[in-house]
Amino acid sequence: MLFKQPLRSAFVLLCLLAFVEARGQTDSVVDKLDSTVLSARKRTSALALGRAGVQKVEIGGLASIPSILGNADPVRFLTSLPGVETGSELDAGLHIQGSESAHSIVSMQGVPVYGAKHLLGIFSVFNPSHFSTMRYSQRAVSANRLGGEVDLTLPEDIPDRTRLDLSTGLISAQGTLRQALGSGTALSLSGRGSFINLLYKDQIKLGEDPLEYGFGDMNLSLVSKPSPQDILVFNLYSGLDKGQFISKDTSLGINAGWGNTLASASWKHSGLLQQIWTSAYDLSVDIDFNSMGASIPSGIRSAGYRASWEGGSWSAGAETAGYRAQLQYPYLKGITTASPGSAEIQTALESSLWGSYEMQLTPELSASLRLRGSHFLDPERQSHWGLSPSGTLRWNLLSAGKLEFTAGTAQQYLFQTGLTNLGMPCEFWFLAGKHADPQSSIYGILSYENTIDRGMYAIKADIYYRTLQGQVEYKGDLFDFMTGTYDLDRELLKGNGRNFGLSVMFHKQSGRLTGWIAYNVGRSLRNFDVPGYEGEYPSNHERLHEFNAVASWNGRGWSAGASVVAASGTPFTAPDSFYLLGNRVISHFGAHNSNRLAPYFRTDLSFNWFIIQDSRQTLGLNFSVYNATMRENPVLYKLYVTEERQFAYGPLNLGFSILPSISIFYRL
């Protein structure tokens, strides 16, 4: 049964969260106003709720949550929250309230990041020690996107002394240096690299085939405060991933490299923020199959200027950005058939204006209105105009909690699609235009939250519904590349969709023991106006049910954490028959996304031992176990060919069933 094993683990965590009392620690804040005494618990959880579905996470507080493989990754942390789907180890996306990964914007200091996660799902491109705060919202308000928004920001304070944050383990090593350069300037430098295959080469496999993988990234930022009203921030990031595997069954070999590069400069003066930025994502995939092969490069580049202003109840802003996208195209090799063309290059210009107003209607009732207008000049030099109004109504029920309703519309001019079943991130970006019309959405979110026992506990619930227009899915396969018959328009399914669901969370946010239990039930449905695809189908990433439990205990000289995730399997399209044509196996597929992978279940454990812990420095060891129950979670289905030339279609698991690790960390 899907929930039998996780329910046992969840029951233990729930009992701990609800009934264990933290002793020997001051966990209350008391304010005296004349003869009135106001008392509230001191929040020790890294997670804080805000208005309109906005949640803020202090990155420094992530040290109190389970650190897997010596790393408390902020994006992996998000997947344990209600409404954010847990992806497989080969899914590099972030799905918020049923939306596609490309529907949500993930950014670094406000600059879009087009590939936010490293492979295996354990690490993102964000080195935690380099950032101060993560802001997460269920809807994108700073960009033309249909989904949510995640932004990691840099610290703006000037350190009073040299700061170091170093960690090395069996999987990776990372470090951050923060150094003051005078009284008003600070430099931050971070680097990270993996050596997964050094010790785990025989454990990390895709099925029975070895998967070679590694990544590295670097951050450099400079903060300057020339006056009390001015802050200058310069930021640079570069990262690279490389992966390779060869299938013994099919003689299929894939060698891929991908990475992000971005830079930005911003100036904040009083309530005005101005920024220039550039961001790029490049993907190169080489495929070899028997005597055939193909090189498939793609990528996207963008650069822009943004200005925003806040003053009292008003805020406003403007942004313009240029795009250059290289679409996926196979350059054939090893066969006589030459590639009939070359990769398509798209260029476009996107501009936006927005404004918002906050108002207090009554002592218990407040509202905010927001209007965003956009213009997109597509690659064919056709203009597309969009107007996205939205509004939020908040009702303070005093001791009964807070109720909030948000509704609005959204536009989007970027797409991401491609092959998802090769074991490598082979999806590419393209721009609205001749291949697909701009996307749009109408959404509504009803939220409730309340705190209990002077802030010791918090509960939160969301009901959401979102319509999606102008959706695409990629239906092609690998052999379209090899035969020289590749045609992007022929491989795209076009239609509409809708997401709806309910998510709830119980959060213990004070005391030595903190954590939460979250549950989400929802649908992510798509329909395509294509013969043979009548009706509604679940999206490729849909999880009908998902349960998450996270618990952390901070003791004296040690800390421990555990997390449990249990979720329904994601859909896939299975073949109902095979036949052999020459040396090629031809599959006849059944109904689109009518099958599902087995349910996903994983338990992670973490323990920190602080050898030295004082006001100046911390030295410790981290012991962690990824997938402690050794559950084998399939990541996709594939065609197997036996030595007797028999065919079978079965699940493919990522080779490691359990991944223990030890790391040493030092903070100054």
Regions found by a protein language model. Give the residues of each.
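Periplasmic N-terminal accessory/gating domains of Gram-negative outer-membrane beta-barrel systems
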Residues: 49-126, 132-140, 155
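Surface-exposed extracellular loop regions of Gram-negative outer-membrane beta-barrel proteins
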Residues: 331-333, 395, 399-444, 465-489, ...
